[in-house]
Amino acid sequence: LDYKAKVKKKVQKRVFQELIALANAHDKPMILHCRYSHARAHQMVKDAGVKQAVFHWYSGPIDLVPEIAASGYYMSACPALIYNPYHIEAIRAVPLSSLLLETDCPVTYQTLESRPVHVRLTLEKAAEARGETLEEIAAATTANARRCFGI
């Protein structure tokens, strides 16, 4: 749900409900792109019984983080940690058991054109922001990814 986009919310909600049904029918995790809609998206996937969901590039309300985590869902950090103070604060609030790392490529972050290799940069910036070691973040996010994606 991207409430910054020009597509009507009603249309987005209908399509989102169809995607939720598809994910549930095939027992697949959902990757959620949310802008100005985190609480609504969370409520919709939770109400529909979605088992696994990732709130990609989490930049939603910090006070929503505990609810998302309590639902068993994940929130991901991305290379925006190099410049976005709000993303840094949000990622600090995410419990380690709910954190994933990503690159969101091919996106350009200021002057950095994101590539898969930049997951290491995301790891480093997440560790720095959270005051945890690279090893702690890497071990936890790897375990989280395995749980979320069944790998």
Task: Say what each PLM segment does.
Residues 1-71, 89, 108-116, 132-135, ...:
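Divalent metal-binding pocket/active-site signature
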Residues 4, 97, 106, 118-123:
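Active-site gating loops and adjacent loop-to-helix segments of metal-dependent hydrolytic enzymes
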Residues 21-22, 119-151:
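Mid-to-C-terminal alpha-helical segments outside catalytic/metal-binding sites
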Residues 57, 79-81, 103-105:
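Short secondary-structure boundary segments
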Residues 74-87:
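Active-site glycine- and acidic-residue-rich loops that bind
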Residues 75, 107, 147:
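Active-site micro-motifs of SAM-dependent methyltransferase domains
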Residues 86-96:
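Short amphipathic alpha-helices and their capping/turn segments at secondary-structure boundaries
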Residues 97-113:
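Short acidic/histidine-rich active-site segments
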